Curated annotation (Swiss-Prot):
It comes from the Bacteria. This is D-inositol 3-phosphate glycosyltransferase. Its EC number is 2.4.1.250. It comes from Mycobacterium sp. (strain KMS). The keyword Magnesium applies. It holds the Pfam family Glyco_trans_4_4. Mg(2+) binds at Y308, R309, A311, T335. Homodimer.
Amino acid sequence: MRLATDQLGRPPQRVAVLSVHTSPLAQPGTGDAGGMNVYVLQSALHMARRGVEVEIFTRATTSADPPVVRVAPGVLVRNVVAGPFEGLDKYDLPTQLCAFTAGVLRAEATHEPGYYDIVHSHYWLSGQVGWLARDRWAVPLVHTAHTLAAVKNAALAEGDSPEPPLRAVGEQQVVDEADRLIVNTELEAEQLVSLHNADPSRIDVVHPGVDLDTFTPGDRAAARAALGLDPRETVVAFVGRIQPLKAPDILLRAAAKLPDVRVLVAGGPSGSGLAAPDNLVALADELGISERVTFLPPQSREDLVRVYRAADLVAVPSYSESFGLVAVEAQACGTPVVAAAVGGLPVAVRDGVTGALVDGHDVGDWAHTIDSLLSRGPATMRRAAVEHAATFSWAHTVDDLLASYGRAISDYRDRHPHADETLSRRTARRFSRRRGVRA
């Protein structure tokens, strides 16, 4: 495994990005939309600024979804019809992968053969489509898992559902088929090797980024006024999907032991926690802290900045987190973070410098750590938080992505020296079909 900036190869001109189960245009914090959506969209936008054209394929979820959305110059989102628009759970999507693949191939057929230089699939469902497209188009496949079933199942929250065996099988297939694997952290690379026997030489470490132009420090009093919060209160915020995996209940239970803390929860339901918002409201009532808990719906990026600025601390108590974009966004706004010491969070948060990491999910430990940080005065960590977040720009992420792409293209050409001949034969067949002649 290596940092992606090592040994830069020829960068691509056009990239096909696959995001089957969730659209990059969806509001993070709702449904299955979260950090991956932000990653897919922001990396595409920043690649386009480098002159790389990006087409993102995702599944249409409403009849109103247009077939094509031009997000920005050089960035296109294609909504592929595959299965019913409403009521299809993420765990039912494997039944629609053939339909999705057909839609992707039909879209590619409107271009000249060889139009895409590379395929980048996100999440295992997309990887299943990716290696079929790779074989059809004779281009390399780069895959980012974002999460792994074995890792999630090893750290299940109470009341959460385990990932099905089908996913683990599918992930193994994608790991075996992908030309390169992109991971968020060194830990994730080690997990791919130990759990899926991945070849370390095919793994690139690429840290996700944060929009440093949007997420910036600002007036805390103004942010609180906009949210209707008392400027004198101590506020600890939770941002994300309301599901057992993200563990917002841990924060509420810890807050019950801290009578001077107000909890601000910004997010919507997803995954196996579809009833979680109501359950979270009920939990606050049961704990006797309803008057100290403020619930907000999922926020736009601009509104999310106010949430981060308004908070004295942001809590990320997840049971599993491949990186933790929320933690970096909060720090970019100058707000320290208390986070679970899991997954990529020890990379996203500098323990004792920009916040604190908590081992495990014991409520007493969380209450003690939050109280300790608040007693020390979070202001002492704010400058360090901003400086740390500045190392995670999308510009850096795209530098590393393009380096990984270049290496994938170079390696693929070395392994498949006749790839151009394959494309030539496909071109001949396609033009013959258009002219009604059998090639």
